[in-house]
């Protein structure tokens, strides 16, 4: 079992877009990477929530 890279409530950035949000949920799987449910403001201003794989996120400054 892998440990989680990000904590609940931790600010994270979506690597591909630079959008920043907060981890509001986490999921672990046997055969794939950990996933995180992130609440963030999309670049067009919409409030958004989506699942992201661990490798698609980085810690926000």
Model-predicted regions and their roles:
Residues 2-7, 11-61:
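Basic/aromatic-rich interaction segments and small domains that mediate binding to polyanionic partners
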